[in-house]
């Protein structure tokens, strides 16, 4: 199984979108500071993930979500969660 996941980085209030084949292990690495992209943005919180049978499907979805249209749709889909977290919508790429 392959996963696309979204983290909320509490320090800067931004999102991180990633891909992995082992979700539990990857989240532990993020939380422990072993991932450079989120090391200085901790604490982090897993707010969403999707599972895929094929690696290519997961990678395509990750790429789409990181793009403008996909990211906009993501914000709409997760609006209730993001509002509770105090996510700043204006002028944010992630």
What kind of feature is each model-predicted range?
Residues 22, 37, 71-74:
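Short, electropositive, low-hydrophobicity segments enriched in small/polar residues
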Residues 1-35, 42, 49-53, 57-63, ...:
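GIY-YIG nuclease catalytic motif and its immediate N-terminal context
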Residues 63-76:
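Short arginine-rich
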